[in-house]
Amino acid sequence: MDAITPESAAACYEAMLSTAAVEITMIGPSAGEAITGIFREAFRKALESRSRQPIDPDFDMEQKIPAEVRRVTEEMDLTQGKMVMGFSLLPAEDKKAQAVSRIATAIYGSSPFSKLFMNVREKLSLCYYCASRTMASYGYMLVDCGIESANQEKAEAEILHQLDEVCAGNFTETEMENARLAVVNSLRTVTDSLSAMSSWLLNEILQGGDSADPTDEIELTQAVTAEEVRDYMRSAKLSVVYLLAGPGKGE
């Protein structure tokens, strides 16, 4: 950030106008063709003086495994610390792999019955909150937690232990069924919100998908097996640990 200058920021902005791919989603009863024409004309007028060469999204589906874990600590005048652990994962190349990722994430850390919530948060009280989220197509997972800085090492160790538990297949059929129910319900409620539906459609565009209806994913979700969850999570490799701590507490 310190290296950014007004000139470099302006150059980046100019490059964005010339190369950025623009995707617009429209949800509602209006005629799509009429809306498309309005936006096309507006962008034509705004950018007609530029030589546009939009860059298509190009996802590298190779998993990035770091040579060593990067650790970053910053200090602020605060009481509650924050830790984020970043993991490299095998990118999900198709809808089936994405369904496996959703179930695995629900079991590990994105639900009220997850390993992280039930153990790191509830049983051991190492965090104020602890949850995971996965960007399956990009091949990464984040575990985000609020902690007392003094508990950082214990919390990190337990988060990794719970990952090991999932990788070993140490979860029950009840946990699998709860995960299926949670993910299916989440898919069904996407269409309840225009913003959620817009995000879904944009994600489909970026990933090269063609599913306009989130409920199309339900059958794949219900078919996910415990073995698939175990094998998927075994690809997780810790890449970075970020700690935001109070003054003198990050040492």
Go through each PLM region and give its residues.
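His/Glu-based metal-binding/catalytic segments typifying zinc-dependent metallopeptidases
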Residues: 52-115, 244-245
